Amino acid sequence: GGARGPAPLTLRNARTFRPFEYFVDMYGLPRYNEIDPTAFVAITFTLLFGIMFGDLGQGILVAVIGWAMWHFKQMPIGRILLPCGISSAVFGLVYGSVFGFEHVLDPMYKALFGLEEKPIEVMNSAMATNIILFAVVIGLTLIMLAMMLNIYSGFKQRNYESAVFGPNGIAGLVFYGSLVLGFGCQLLFDVHVLNLPYVLLLIVLPLVVIFFREPLGKLMAGEKDWKPEKWGEFIIQNFFEEFEILLSYVSNTMSFLRVAAFVLVHAGMMMAVFAIAELFGPLGFTIAVIIGNALVMGMEALLVSIQVMRLEFYEMFSRYYVGDGRAFQPLSVSADK
């Protein structure tokens, strides 16, 4: 009806991604000309779930339960659990964990790759450091991908302030990427790139650009009154905003440490299950391992889903997605008239 706000829409996605529209619905539908994040959510959610919940046995079980929930009860959540379970099983292969038994797959690694034992021993302290590093790298990558989506979305909507000059636009990407590159080279390879021109051009300049994003965006869009009305007010407000933006870069990146935490928590919880199980005889051991697996699986599937959803909404959506569109409702004749 008429020109009331943005045009309504229905989400249209490939069959594989369609179950994940559930999360997009929960957050808010895209505006008419905004990108539909379903595919990005589907891929990143499935990957993160698998990394944080890597167990070949439990993963297959989660997938089977998901399939059954969808097949027999038509529960949409089942179609989300199915790919997540498969992803979990794949990472379980990488971690060498089957229902918490950490060395069952060693013969397979030996046969296939000639390794003495599995490549990733999660509970090994040297490995734990690598897992934490890996989690941060995933975070950096996903945050930069979210920024790229925002740049694409901004150009599509002709919102230059957001796409070019904003904290999640080209300026933000250059700033964040340059910091990551600078510190990464320094810490990992001991290569010194953070010299004065690098810092001024790639770190300070983008920050200045972000500070003046409003007038710059208006200028680029060709608006006449691009200057702020009160410079004093503008400077104070943007000073605090800039500070908040810097904090969000740090906190969003650190937030991905939960990925590493859950990899370690999973291994730790299964160790606890086996420690308890070993107190019993053979029959008691079997029962304890089965109950322990069921408990850990149920609890972790829930916790990991919540954590991944948190990462999707707070760490990624907040960078590239508004989600205040409205759903398309086909016209219907109301019966109460």
Can you say where each PLM-predicted feature lies in the sequence?
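Conserved, carboxylate-rich catalytic/transport cores that coordinate ions
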Residues: 1-337
